[in-house]
Amino acid sequence: MPADHNPSIKTSHGVLHLIPVGLGEAPISAWLPPDAQILAGQLSTYIAENAKTARAFLKLTPLTRPLQDITIHELNPRLDDATLQTWLAPLRSGVSIGLVSEAGCPAVADPGARAVAIAHQWGVAVKPWVGPSSILLGLMASGLDGQRFAFHGYAPVEAGERVKQLKAWELSSAKQHQTQMLIETPYRNQAMFTSLIEHLKGSTRLCLARALTTNDEWVRTLTVAQWKSQPIPQLDKFPTLFLFQAAA
């Protein structure tokens, strides 16, 4: 429903624009539509997961003002709600604001979801723009169930708890015919891969989606039993999405 016909949307307010950021070194033309590039270059205020990467992103857009004149608030999970509401307050005066993640789509596995929730509480229009999402791209390329899936973020760091959690997710996958997705800090990727092939069932299908949209992109899905007979893939230093689906 158009904003001007939706009584819950206040047309005197600005718009919270959810603008994706690239996952790697590909040119901006490969992952962000021209209209979104133009819009991104026009906004004067941003809320970002990481101010440094937000500035790097903005340098790729057709800026209409000097970069130093753009306000960038850095959002982290520990930020109090009162401060976040203060940053978003210009929306209620008709000023539009951009929301960006460190990489990929904002507000998906990202603290920016808090800003979106506040915008909805205030009746502010929220505009999501098309762009890269490692979760969606990895799922697309995996060949696993794309209708029932769950993204869990990080598994526990402690070895015993990690194994317990992986087995619980595998059981859930088998019962619900559901793809399970998780990530790890790049320097722990090799250890995570080892945990997966050591503790998941041999019939479980496991996909590695490494460095999506970059020159080092590599995606492969095999059963756990098949992975055990393969050379160990190089995963350290590369953002990697792990996906698996257990046999019913």
Which residue stretches match the model-derived regions?
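Acidic beta-strand-to-loop metal/phosphate-binding motif
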Residues: 48, 98-106, 179-184
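A contiguous loop/helix-start segment that scaffolds small-molecule binding in enzyme catalytic cores
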Residues: 2-17, 71, 95-96, 174-248
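Class I SAM-dependent methyltransferase SAM-binding "motif I" and its flanking Rossmann-like core
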Residues: 17, 114-172
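Short active-site oxyanion
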Residues: 40-46, 123-127, 179-180
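Conserved helicase motor
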Residues: 73-80, 155-159
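Glycine-rich, flexible N-terminal cofactor/catalytic loop recognition
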Residues: 2-75
